[in-house]
């Protein structure tokens, strides 16, 4: 019997030509010590067209304690202004903490955009993708419960609405990196770790 796949309502997103890079929407974990090069790697991944093309995301949001002062973010600042034309007054890219209320609205907006696009006739083939980066905030003490729920939602549900998420951290076992987050990761970039213990933690988690 010839069983044909049911046509779904999924949209296509720009993808990397390399099999090493994860497909979009992605859920990435960047694990490494301070100064290991995580931020530089992520900036290049976002802005360099050799990875995912010129414009893989329509909006980018970057949460980091040094979001306003870090010179390493300058290429991203130029990218969101010159390429994405993202209005920094209305829809700011950079946040110095996990702004739960703001990001919740962003995710809800993505859900509505996706549902509206699915209802269109003819239905668009290309999805409206965005990227949320949480950089060195996995050990944040501010609004831990609400922030944890938001991060869980980003790694579990938000991908269905075209949301890619990157969590950059120095340690694997922290309050915001819940078991739900760890099992839903689609890509891990690991740098030199601080100790053999941290290396063992990583291997126990991901070397099944």
Regions from the PLM with identified roles:
Residues 49-50, 80:
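Active-site catalytic pocket residues across diverse enzymes, especially alpha/beta-hydrolases
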Residues 1-16, 67:
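N-terminal pre-Walker A segment at the start of P-loop NTPase domains
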Residues 12, 16-25, 52:
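Phosphate-binding P-loop
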Residues 6-8, 52, 89, 97:
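Alpha-helical structural elements
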Residues 83-101:
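Short acidic-hydrophobic, aromatic-tinged amphipathic segments that line or gate anion-handling sites
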Residues 72-83:
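Short, aromatic/basic amphipathic alpha-helical patches
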């Amino acid at each position: 019997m010839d069983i044909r796949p049911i046509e779904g309502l999924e949209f296509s997103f720009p993808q990397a030509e390399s099999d090493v890079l994860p497909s979009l929407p992605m859920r990435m974990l960047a694990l490494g010590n301070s100064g290991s090069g995580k931020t530089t790697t992520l900036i290049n991944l976002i802005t360099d067209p050799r990875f995912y093309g010129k414009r893989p995301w329509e909006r980018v949001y970057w949460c980091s304690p040094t979001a306003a002062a870090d010179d390493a973010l300058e290429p991203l600042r130029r990218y969101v202004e010159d390429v994405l034309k993202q209005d920094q007054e209305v829809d700011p890219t950079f946040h110095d903490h996990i702004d739960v209320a703001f990001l919740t609205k962003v995710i809800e907006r993505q859900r509505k955009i996706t549902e509206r696009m699915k209802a269109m006739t003819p239905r668009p083939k290309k999805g409206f993708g965005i990227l949320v980066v949480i950089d060195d905030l996995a050990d944040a003490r501010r609004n831990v419960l609400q922030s944890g729920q938001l991060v869980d939602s980003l790694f579990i549900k938000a991908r269905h609405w075209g949301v890619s998420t990157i969590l950059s951290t120095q340690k694997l076992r922290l309050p915001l990196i819940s078991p739900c987050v760890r099992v839903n990761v689609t890509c891990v970039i690991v740098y030199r770790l601080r100790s053999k213990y941290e290396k063992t933690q990583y291997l126990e988690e991901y070397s099944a």
